[in-house]
Amino acid sequence: MPALFVQERMGVNRKPFRMFKFRTMYDRAEEMRAQIEEFNESSGGLFKIRMDPRITPVGRFLRRFSLDEVPQLLNVVRGEMVLVGPRPLPRRDFENYYEEWHYSRHQGMPGLTCLWQVSGRSDLDFHNMCILDVYYLRNQGWLMDLKILLKTIWVVLFARGAY
């Protein structure tokens, strides 16, 4: 099983791109999703389960401290992502949007971290994630980015809302 996981995500202006992560799930995790869909603890375009059985023990550690996201620095270097911007959703989750305004979160470049990650992370539902993403896009600037980057360090170190 390769250490890197590549998944199609939705980027700026709904353009798909290949996002890199360290693998944190067992093989055939996507096939298993249908069997555990009823345990989804989120809504809309998000699929979150606190004790997701598809995640390996090492994967749980990597996710707890967001270390699985490190390969996305390659996406930043390639110009597909920026440090701060709305997190890109997997294409499958993207197709679950249920209100037209939710798509407006794709008017900016996707980022490694974002306002909703430092405001609750996985504890926020899809609707509030979109509200924070749209707020960020309408108010973004270097000072807001700096605040989000600094808060990200705190959130990651203390694993706030990580699962």
Question: Which residues make up each language-model segment?
Answer:
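Conserved small/aromatic sequence motifs within transmembrane helices
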Residues: 1-163
